Amino acid sequence: MTVSILLDSLKDDGQRLSECRHESPFSILGPQPFKDKWIIRIWMPEASEVELITQQTKIKLQNPNHEWIFEGVLEKDPGNDYQIKVNRGGIEHVQHDPWSFRKEWMGEIDRHLFAEGNHHHIWRKMGAHLTEINKKQGVMFCLWAPHAKSVSVIGDLNSWDGRHHPMQKRLGGIWELFIPGLSEGDLYKYEIRTEKGHCYEKADPYGFQHEVRPAKSSVISKIDSFQWNDQSWISNRDNRDPLEQPISVYEMHLGSWMHASSDDPFINSNGEHRAPVPAADMKPGSRLLTYKELANKVIPYVKERGFTHIELMPISEHPFDGSWGYQVTGWYAPTSRFGSPDEFRAFVDSCHKEGIGIILDWVPGHFPKDQHGLAYFDGSHLYEHSDPRVGEHKEWGTLIFNYSRNEVRNFLVANLIFWFDQFHIDGIRVDAVASMLYKDYLRPEGEWIPNEDGGNENFEAVRFLQQANHVLFQHFPGALSIAEESTTWSGVTKPTDMDGLGFNLKWNMGWMHDMLDYFEIDPWFRQFNQNNITFSICYNFTENFMLALSHDEVVHGKSHLLHKMPGDDWQKYANTRALLAYMWTHPGKKTIFMGMEFGQRQEWNVWDDLQWDLLNYEPHKGIQKLVDDLNNLYKREPALWRNDFDEYGFQWIDCDDNKNSVISFMRREKTDGEWLVIVANFTPQNHSNYRIGVPVDGFYEEIFNTDASQYGGSNLGNMGGKSTDLYNIHGYENSIDLCLPPLSVLVLKHKSKKN
């Protein structure tokens, strides 16, 4: 039956559709009731003929109201059980009608939870989802853009023309459209038309995959299809207190750890060759390793070194390599530089198989201004504050999230849960927390707005961080949440129910700066700076601290760790060994940046890879061997980690020998009373008869010595250990007389009492 219904209103609708100004295509397109019949209207730009195909009939549709609105009349509601055959320029194809799939994807409860900021799994609704509706395979698109005039899906499916697939606006500023026939790997973006008539092409904020830079489109990708094999790991993790475990972290940047030749085969997890991703223009002939290649190389390397965790600098999709990953545009997608999301899942799964946890750097403090990203998303300051005194980091050239907006907080909190849920990560390190906590961070007077109490604290950011940590531990009780917080803000690692921020670890930035300042001093002048290496204990038990020597300390002219050290090469190596050993024996969990474990000489360069050729030289092998043995010692001796955050776990023997730059202390394990004695000599002068007090008589075995020849040292030591003498010193009746090698750290363990 072919009946044309002439409606003046449809001419206006057609005009608005053709100009991408229509926010409710479902009101006119698809099956529409008309008296006792049904009109089927199809929007098909640039089509010359459209035919409706049902199981019973075929109808050539007419376009009496607008050249691209085709319609016909049926006796009954066909639902979405029909197809349309389209002729464009003599080329025909058959498809299902997107506007016949009218059921709301985002339900009332979903909208309510999202609007109040409490939808912890919002990614299961937002974004592009491969799904089936009424036995029709396709993709459901769902986007939050409340101030947009219209939103269209664009991609290869419509030659990136926003006129073809306008989305339907729902309650709460949600836009939806189901497009049948799309499949995994298809590219798409959202074309957003603003109230002022401006048009933006935006990547999907909730996209699960994006193109390799410099391309910017989102990629349709499956979730929940990967077959995990780490159930035992996850169960064990979530049923123990991570703070009562040894934690030794290898911080790394996947793109600059190691490169491969562009001539080497570049093969994905399906065994398919694909175009290599260049490492950088400044390094022609090299390419990035894939997630699969990284798994094959990084995991055995880290396991051999003895680290318990890998911390990855941000791998959320980001357009600019030079940002190191800290300017994110694809929050719900691992970067495609190294492969697909499932290939990253396989990387994590392989880490867990080998007993290695994964920590990701997470950057909820700011985002870049890239046009395809979150900035000015729907023609309004949707994700950021509108006032630059609140919403912009001018020094960084980035924007600040509006933490007071529920939907924005929801975006971030759900993103945190997403990485644990979808990629089985074990922890996060939150970058630049201080920049979130203080409204005047890096701002001169007059360029920030005080809070309601007249102070500089950002209460909105505080509440966001508390919510994020509370929700994280609610879902994943064994997780690590680490704050990079560089000030003295109180309660960073206190639980949220005690008005803390809720992290369970905080980088000890003060320790890091004091240590590096101290070790850069000529050893003969260190006697005047003894406080640098002892002061950290004064505040050590106020927070749950992690000691970190991070990437920030080996860039921008600061030199790599080895080259910070004074003296000739021998002293540089010895100082490096001593610093690392002091770090491993000091209370607190551990993190070092890649390259430090073998004495990298050059500053870290994001465009280059590490100086692996240095391992051809014995001193660098020695540092690597030292780190291996430190990690093994650390994991083997509970006194070095079980009591990190309790004053009982640490006791000075002597911290006042400034003249010799020597310190001595004990680490104690609370369950069986075992303890270790640590003695550090931070000058090149060895001491052949250096006496320290000890709490119990007997034999003290020397279980570690940074001056051992296997590490590149001079091999001075104590012939395996020393027995005590009844000689009162440092408040103890018993003492041992030690040989202290130059620039060294000794670890001794009480073995037996005298008869």
Curated annotation (Swiss-Prot):
GO biological process: glycogen biosynthetic process
GO cellular component term, pick one: cytosol
Sections of the chain in a coiled coil: none
Record carries keyword Glycosyltransferase: yes
CDD domains hit by this protein: AmyAc_Glg_BE (cd11322), E_set_GBE_prok_N (cd02855)
Keywords assigned by UniProt, alphabetized: Carbohydrate metabolism, Glycogen biosynthesis, Glycogen metabolism, Glycosyltransferase, Transferase
Reaction(s) the record says it catalyses: Transfers a segment of a (1->4)-alpha-D-glucan chain to a primary hydroxy group in a similar glucan chain
GO molecular function: 1,4-alpha-glucan branching enzyme activity; cation binding; hydrolase activity, hydrolyzing O-glycosyl compounds
Active site: 431, 484
SUPFAM superfamilies: (Trans)glycosidases, E set domains, Glycosyl hydrolase domain
EC number: 2.4.1.18
Keyword Thylakoid assigned: no
Pathway(s) it belongs to: Glycan biosynthesis; glycogen biosynthesis
Self-association state and partner proteins as the record states: Monomer.
Purpose of the protein: Catalyzes the formation of the alpha-1,6-glucosidic linkages in glycogen by scission of a 1,4-alpha-linked oligosaccharide from growing alpha-1,4-glucan chains and the subsequent attachment of the oligosaccharide to the alpha-1,6 position.
HAMAP family found in the cross-reference section: GlgB (MF_00685)
Protein known as: 1,4-alpha-glucan branching enzyme GlgB
Source species of the chain: Prochlorococcus marinus (strain NATL1A)
Organism lineage string: Bacteria, Bacillati, Cyanobacteriota, Cyanophyceae, Synechococcales
